[in-house]
Amino acid sequence: MRPRTAKHLGILAIVVAATSAGCSSSSSSKAEPSTSTSTPPTTGPHRTKAGLAKIKHVVIIMQENRSFDSYFGTYPGADGIPSKNGRFTVCLPRPSGPCQAPFHDKYDANSGAGHAHSDAIKDINGGRMNGFVRQAASSRRGCRAVQDPACAHGLQSDVMGYHDAREIPNYWTYAKDFVLNDRMFEPVTAWSLPAHLYMVSAWSAKCASRLASSCRNDITGPYSLKEQQRFVDRAIATGTAPVHDAWTSITYLLHKQHVSWGYYVETGKEPDCADDAATCTAPPQDYKTPGIWNPLPLFTDVQEDGQLKNVQPVESFRAAAKAGKLPAVSWITPAQVHSEHPPASVHAGQAWVTNLVNDVMRGPEWSSTAIFVSWDDWGGFYDHVAPPAVDGNGYGLRVPGLVISPYAKRGYIDHQTLSHDAYLKFIEDVFLDGQRLDPATDGRPDPRPLVRESAPQLGDLANDFDFNQSPRAPEKLSPNPRPGPASSIAG
């Protein structure tokens, strides 16, 4: 346990604001049914600039800590939990006793397991994808604080549990009526902080100065609590903003091209612990306080471009959606209660996402908006697909991905290999004429190991749209839906 408080981040917020005011796993078998509702990617008119130009607003909603198999492992046609004749064929070894097979988890509060870089390596286990139960057992140390995942319900690991339309009917409805990405991978084999850094910059690093060239690859932290405190102490002593994230974020390219953006933070408690500690006293979270789920205020390009004002409370997003004043690009991050991060309520998270989607659908800009919903990391939950290697940092484990738009294909399952880097690629293609976060061309050279958006493995989210179709009418769902039917595969 590493207790923490919000004191150091609260001071940091003041300083930044002041200085910036200017048994075995069978991963090769497929889940039943084998008939997919998807169609192969094409190179037709939906890929043209004219098609992409119909998108004026991109909204990215990033939830917390769920693997693909834990939410969509029994979804018809998706690459889900291995099964045959309606029965699961996978059973993972425990530290002792019989192996653990997948099972339907009816609980709204789940436990999950460790999800640091070292935990990802154990879960993947050299591509065998059979380390989840053993890793969960080794990471559980009893119920010690309300934030401890072990407090959810008993001490039995639930990492092999899955939900279906009974628990997450709206997510399954979005998949049925819009697009489900069944090969969406976390961009990095790590936890929330590196994942959220990748979400806005396609990299995670440590920097020795405010120069981008001083940054060095780091996916395990990249900053410990002691280091964060040193940043604050240095900032107070010198009256300057702390040196922190000096590599280039996507906001730099957007600002150069006069493309509007907003990063919206829900006020409440942070979803997880600093340094991926097992337990902590959850500190407050708000848009004024830089942190794991609010990293952009610590980017030097955001500070130097005078863009701190673009980091706002989530209420500003809702007002903008209602008034027809959405920025071109929006990111939205939840507080603990709506994050779905164990042991937070799955239902509460789904309701929160549904309300955000409904806000856009009720507004005048629905007809020109693409909404992407995903989860920042796998949370220790089982997934059977070994992540592809794109560089030394990832990809990480598979997470769910949903695409909701008036131009989204209906009932389409996208089998392309994707990661959250694909969101940046889509933004760049829609608003920046395909410019990438490339040190050779973006004017802020940093030593990132790879231009992630140009990775040959990475698919293209444009394939999820049909720009020849008329914009689809809004499909507003109840945030408190009735449970859906059980899946056809027995657990």
What is the role of each PLM region?
Residues 23-491:
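N-terminal pro-sequences and low-complexity stem/linker regions of secreted or lumenal proteins
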